[in-house]
Amino acid sequence: MVKYFSENLSDKNSIIKQKILELCMNSGDFSIADFARELNCSVPTTTKIVGELIDDGWLEDLGKKGSASGRRPSIFGLNPEAGFFVGVDLERNHANIMTMDFKGQTLSYDEDVEFTLRNTEDSCRKLCGLIRKTLEDN
C-alpha cells in the first residue's frame, strides 16, 4: 500500500521526495549518486529519502547496473504498482477509456465504449460506473 507524503509540502524532505519522483517520471531510473548529483543533495540524505520512498511503495530497487570498473551501483525506479492513471475521452455517443500504471505503461484501452453524453446526474453516474468497471478489470 502506498503511503502519502507529508501534509507540509514545504518540508525539505517532502520537496526532495517530489523531485526524485519527477526525475524518475521524466528521465527514467537513477542510482543514489545520480539522484544526489541531480538534486545537489548529500548522498546520505538521498539514501535515506530513497529508502523512505521504497518503504512507502513509490520506488523499487531494480538491481545493480553493469559497470566497466568499480562497484556496480543499485538502480532505483518508479514502482509501477504505486498507482495508476485513467484517461477518459468523451464523445457524444461513446467514450474511450485508457488506464496506465505509475510508470506510464498502458494497461488497457477500451475504444468506442457505448455511452451517451448528457447533462444529467444519471449520465454522470453511468460514466462513473464505466470508469469503475475499467478499474476493476485491471
Sequence positions of predicted segments:
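Electropositive phosphate-/nucleotide-binding environments in soluble metabolic enzymes
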Residues: 10-14, 18, 43-47, 121
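Short secondary-structure capping/turn micro-motifs that flank functional sites
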Residues: 40, 69-70
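Extreme N-terminal segment that seeds HTH/winged-HTH DNA-binding domains in transcriptional regulators
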Residues: 1-37
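Gly/Thr-rich phosphate-binding beta-strand-loop-beta motif of the actin/hexokinase/Hsp70
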Residues: 70-109
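Short, basic, alpha-helical segments at the C-terminal edge of helix-turn-helix-like DNA-binding modules
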Residues: 63-69
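N-terminal phosphate-binding loop and adjacent alpha-helix
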Residues: 109-138
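N-terminal helix-turn-helix
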Residues: 29-62
